[in-house]
């Protein structure tokens, strides 16, 4: 996954995203799917500046949360945010190279991060998530998805991506989240050209996860489906 853009935006990331109440609601919805006990471990894939981590550390007071991200600047901000917290750990990694031993985690979570995985590496990413989860460990993954598969110049896919991104951007304009609106509009050419942004269908990720050993897969629908957000929940099959 490319890191240059996220290294550049790291300092302003929270300022851009914090006014987006929809983004904050998705974080809460992910958290509602995580039910931990004492000593359990959660992995946050693509932790960024630590917004989902912060929510989980608050709502899962007996759990340990490990965040990984490919961007060094994001990691520095996240590590500073949780400095001195013995239940938080931050390191460099991505969906294809998590950097932990096998069967270490009870939960793996991710929010708007895995669409940065190169299309040809999606199967490897699904396998890596399965590797680090314990048997019966749970994945909770939220992202933006297209309804139409296809290449960079596929008209149906292009239209679907543009409609979703513009709808979400206009929603942020209505919220007064002006910088988030601009950020979303600036990403449209990258999504269209498949340049560091590789939004795909829910069904494609479900197929990769099933092949990697996940079962009890379900798609959790969230408000404003026109934005493309869905939450995928799955359980790693027992040994």
Task: Write out the residue ranges for each language-model feature.
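Short glycine-centered segments of the SAM/dcSAM-binding site in methyltransferase folds
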Residues: 41, 136-138
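A short acidic, Gly/Pro-enriched loop at the edge of an enzyme's catalytic core
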Residues: 96-107
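A short SAM/SAH-binding and catalytic strip from SAM-dependent methyltransferases
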Residues: 107-121
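A short glycine-rich, Lys/Arg-flanked "PGG" loop and its adjoining helix->strand segment in the class I
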Residues: 123-135
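C-terminal alpha-helical "lid/dimerization" subdomain adjacent to the S-adenosyl-L-methionine
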Residues: 142-210
